[in-house]
């Protein structure tokens, strides 16, 4: 089996319909408006966000989040993944009445259990929500910087790309950077190339979540390649959410050809009827990537991972026999 690594997945968005159904039974909740026939049901980006939030609302305790992380990571490992980074949202935790620390500790419990069962290594990226404003993002950054949890190794920002300008959030990222956290920011998904450029100018990330609309500006693509910024690309998500109309129009092959460092990711997998394994299969089928190139993409993900060098070396040691075989 092809070994894989993922850098871009939202943990609340990774809850399978089966797990959400079990949580609904636990809390006596009605999920018929957003899960039908054992699958998530939504029609557009607005109703997707509603379904996402309704599913997330059914995780309310430290034990619930431990179960969520353990279940997802075991599923990921079964598909060949040896490493996972996922985005966490202190804002979702607080909406559920859980402190950010208890939320993080719960997720960490699940991560430890999944590693014991499968060997999968994983880390958390704390995220602020862009459309909640700079103060909320700074609050998330302060938590990330101060929690000192060994499995929290990055800070990022998700949410509505059209809300505010990256410069408004620069201070939050400075807080995280000074604490030694890796930096990633969502840009170039629903915002155009100018969104990616502004993120590079004002946030100075080592990675960009999505970033695919950089393709609209050839000079920007060259800059991304020259600076070695890693793009966390989510092809199935991009097509399902109509960022691009079909895989044949997705710029992944052009980004690779331009020398950009790219990775493959599932974003919110059950919502988009995907998985990390499917993302790799899509790249092979629609982008013409052979096994050597797919292994190189996994290597890029490990190179860009927010881990200590001992962990990185151990991940490469697992990947090396596969690459050489």
UniProtKB/Swiss-Prot annotation:
Instruction: Report keywords, A-Z.
Output: Hydrolase, Metal-binding, Nucleotide metabolism, Zinc
Q: Which cofactor does it need?
A: Zn(2+)
Q: Which residues bind substrate?
A: 268
In short, the EC number is 3.5.4.2
Cofactor binding, per record:
Binds 1 zinc ion per subunit.
| InterPro entries in the cross-refs | A_deaminase_dom, ADE, Ado/ade_deaminase, Metal_Hydrolase
Note the SUPFAM superfamilies from the entry.
Metallo-dependent hydrolases (SSF51556)
Q: Extract one GO molecular function annotation from the record.
A: zinc ion binding
A Gene Ontology BP annotation from the UniProt entry = adenine catabolic process
Active site (record annotation): 189
Work out whether the entry's keyword set contains Hydrolase: yes
Annotated residues for binding of Zn(2+): 8, 10, 186, 267
Q: Where is this site: Important for catalytic activity?
A: 210
What reaction gets catalysed by this protein? adenine + H2O + H(+) = hypoxanthine + NH4(+)
What this chain does, per the entry, is described as: Catalyzes the hydrolytic deamination of adenine to hypoxanthine. Plays an important role in the purine salvage pathway and in nitrogen catabolism.
What does the sequence similarity comment in the record state about its family? Belongs to the metallo-dependent hydrolases superfamily. Adenosine and AMP deaminases family. Adenine deaminase type 2 subfamily.
Supply the name of the protein. Adenine deaminase
Q: What is the lineage of its organism?
A: Bacteria, Pseudomonadati, Pseudomonadota, Alphaproteobacteria, Hyphomicrobiales
